[in-house]
């Protein structure tokens, strides 16, 4: 959806910068090695992702905003809020860890049922990944059941975040073109300067 949105914004004459979660070169190698060896603890995940986010804020996001660009972030601090808390990390501690975050103008939660999310993943690759299924938490010996339990925790936490921070919610089960139309309608007031300012992190 963000790729389509980015293309549309550029066609409308806007300068657009894209920032992706866990993409900083500072930590990408460390993260990859840790996952392969199954060495990452919940706290380690928090610290690594915070380091990644901090680097992208300073290197990509803030300079782009100062240049007048629209920054589209594929996942933001709310990803850490949901995943880390689902892994058992203290909610207040995680929020404090990201207190440096630039306030987003708009944050959107693409809501999708667990069974649909699972189907989409397995349609693209043969099996679930160890950490994405929450196997490190010992929730269940079966990887699929562990995924459902872990992702269920994440979804519950996202619902808490939606209420706490006022995230916009999109039904991610709808056809792509309908979602894209809704996205454009949602952000148009912001482009015209008719919407409220930044929301809380």
Predicted features, each with a name:
Residues 80-153:
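A glycine- and Lys/Arg-enriched "phosphate-lid" helix/loop adjacent to the NTP-binding pocket
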Residues 1-11:
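A conserved segment at the C-terminal end of the G1
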Residues 72, 108, 158:
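Conserved RecA-like P-loop NTPase ATPase core
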Residues 10, 65, 162:
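Conserved ATPase "switch" residues in P-loop NTPase domains
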Residues 19, 110, 170:
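Hydrophobic residues at beta-strand termini and immediately following loops
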Residues 14-102:
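ATP-dependent small-molecule kinase phosphotransfer cores
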Residues 4-6, 122-201:
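NTP-dependent small-molecule kinase module
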Residues 23-26, 77-78, 112-118, 175-176:
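Conserved nucleotide-binding/hydrolysis micro-motifs of P-loop NTPases
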């Amino acid at each position: 959806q963000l790729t389509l949105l980015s293309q549309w914004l550029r066609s409308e004459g806007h300068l657009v910068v894209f920032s992706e979660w866990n993409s900083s070169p500072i930590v990408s190698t460390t993260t990859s090695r840790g996952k392969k060896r199954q060495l990452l603890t919940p706290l380690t995940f928090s610290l690594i992702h915070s380091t990644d986010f901090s680097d992208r804020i300073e290197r990509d996001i803030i300079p782009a905003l100062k240049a007048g660009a629209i920054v589209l972030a594929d996942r933001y601090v709310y990803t850490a809020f949901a995943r880390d808390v689902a892994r058992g990390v203290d909610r207040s501690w995680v929020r404090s860890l990201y207190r440096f975050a630039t306030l987003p103008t708009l944050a959107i939660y693409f809501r999708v049922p667990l069974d649909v999310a699972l189907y989409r993943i397995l349609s693209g690759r043969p099996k679930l990944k160890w950490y994405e299924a929450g196997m490190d938490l010992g929730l269940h010996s079966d990887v699929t059941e562990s995924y459902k339990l872990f992702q269920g925790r994440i979804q519950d936490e996202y619902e808490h975040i939606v209420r706490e921070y006022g995230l916009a919610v999109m039904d991610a089960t709808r056809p792509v073109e309908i979602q894209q139309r809704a996205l454009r309608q949602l952000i148009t007031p912001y482009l015209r300067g008719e919407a409220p300012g930044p929301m809380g992190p």
